[in-house]
Regions:
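RNase H-like, Mg2+-dependent phosphodiesterase core
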Residues: 1-204
Length: 204
């Protein structure tokens, strides 16, 4: 496929993935957060959630479900998302908390923290009246939120905000697992990121 043809396809994909955000913006919603997590399946490491608020004119090509992207591509996109986003919040829950309350509840806590941090950063940037007007979640619902929310099945492949959050969450967690690799060299965390590969099982 020629470069020009690929770019056309990427622009079409981006247009499709902005549809949810576009509809909300047309209904008067100013700040829309996409939220996703990574780390619900590994044998080791934290669950990490990200909340990303993008400007309506966001036009970075290639943003997609982080699982569909190479590590090199995720790293490059994450750097650009951090430059372009209006706000990015991160939430984490470590293994001890996951064991205490279960992975789903730990994920929800991490997501709530990520949303709270993103909103705080919005206020710092745009003033105390700024607040998230709608939250797009990837296949999850958070109880107790006053902010309107939508849960999208396969949201990281359907919403650009959720996709951006999936990339930020993945890169953030990967960096933490690389740090863990220095502390626990037997488990190859720098390669498997805590997932159940053969090397990880052999380390156990």
């Amino acid at each position: 496929m020629k470069k020009e043809e690929r770019e056309v396809l990427l622009r079409e994909k981006l247009c499709q993935m902005k549809e949810f955000e576009r509809e909300l913006t047309e209904n008067g919603i100013c700040y829309i957060a996409g939220v996703d997590e990574v780390g619900r399946g590994p044998l080791a490491g934290p669950v990490v959630a990200a909340a990303v608020v993008l400007p309506p004119d966001f036009s970075l090509l290639g943003v997609d479900d982080s699982k569909k992207l190479s590590e090199k591509k995720r790293e490059a996109l994450a750097a650009e998302i951090r430059e372009l986003a209006w706000a990015i919040g991160i939430g984490k829950r470590e293994p001890a908390r996951i064991d205490e309350i279960n992975i789903l509840e730990a994920t929800k806590e991490a997501m709530a923290d990520a949303v709270q941090e993103a909103e705080r950063l919005l206020r710092e940037r745009f003033g105390q009246e700024a607040k998230i007007g709608h939250i797009l979640f990837d296949a999850i619902h958070l109880d107790g939120l006053e902010t309107p929310q939508t849960s999208l099945i396969h949201g990281d492949a359907r919403s650009v905000s959720i996709a951006a959050a999936s990339i930020i969450a993945k890169v953030t967690r990967d960096h933490q697992m690389i740090e863990y690799a220095g502390q626990y060299p037997d488990y190859s965390f720098e390669k498997n990121k805590g997932y159940g590969t053969r090397a990880h099982y052999e380390g156990i």
